[in-house]
Swiss-Prot record:
Residues 175-228 are annotated as: Disordered. The gene is TIFY10A. A motif (Jas) lies at residues 164-189. Pfam families: Jas_motif, tify. This is Protein TIFY 10a. Interacts with COI1A and COI1B in a coronatine-dependent manner. Coronatine is an analog of jasmonoyl isoleucine (JA-Ile). It comes from Oryza sativa subsp. japonica. A motif (Nuclear localization signal) lies at residues 166-173.
């Protein structure tokens, strides 16, 4: 019985201690945070919750203040110096915005396209302009022209009397070449007078080859005498 009573007293004292501690923490939340108990007071609980942006609009790791500071520098960089070469003159403009420069370039391109689509000149005028440009494009020194004309070879004009002689000479050469070709094709052919003695010598050296045509006619007179 004594042990049961002592247990009830201990549990009641522990419950009282916990209730006192909770009251103290609620009243003094900052002090409890310093103690490191991990319990926040009523003031911390009433603070608004901060949300984390998973898809930020400004890329990069810099803060918004840094981004705001960079914008005027970018605007200053857009304004630069512009130089224009027109009509043999140089025009310089300081702090010229980039947007106006783009507009100016578009206007210049449009004007160049309209100039190309202008009315064409007549053929005679274009021919004269082309001739003038060709002459002016390659200027020749005045001192070199007479020397070049003097040293230029004069064309040879053939005389009418020399033409028949040249034709005869060419014909004679053609006939000589043709004769040489014929001799080269048949080198062993000769005249018929040269071939006749050769045939006679062959017939005399080989009489047996010509027995048929060279057989003499029989002498009938001798046979008649013997028969008598």
């Amino acid at each position: 019985m004594a042990s049961a009573k002592s247990g009830e007293r201990g549990s009641s004292s522990f419950a009282m201690a916990c209730s006192l501690l909770s009251r103290y923490v609620r009243q003094n939340g900052a002090a409890a945070g310093e103690l490191g108990l991990g319990i926040r007071g009523e003031a911390d609980a009433n603070k608004g919750k901060e949300t984390m942006e998973l898809f930020p609009q400004n890329s990069g790791f810099g803060s918004e203040a840094a981004a705001v500071k960079e914008t005027p520098d970018a605007r200053e960089q857009e304004k630069r110096q512009l130089t224009i070469f027109y009509g043999g003159k140089v025009l310089v403009f300081d702090d010229f915005p980039a947007e106006k420069a783009k507009d100016l370039m578009q206007m210049a391109s449009k004007s160049s396209s309209t100039a190309q689509n202008c009315v064409l000149l007549p053929s005679s005028a274009t021919a004269t302009v082309a001739d003038n440009t060709k002459v002016s494009a390659v200027p020749a020194p005045a001192s070199a022209l007479p020397v070049a004309q003097a040293n230029a070879p004069k064309p040879v004009r053939p005389n009418a009397a020399d033409l028949p002689q040249a034709r005869k000479a060419s014909l004679h050469r053609f006939l000589e070449k043709r004769k040489d070709r014929l001799q080269a094709k048949a080198p062993y052919q000769g005249s018929p007078s040269d071939a006749s003695p050769v045939k006679k010598e062959l017939q005399e050296s080989q009489p047996w080859l010509g027995l048929g045509p060279q057989v003499a006619a029989p002498d009938l007179s001798l046979r008649q005498e013997s028969s008598q």
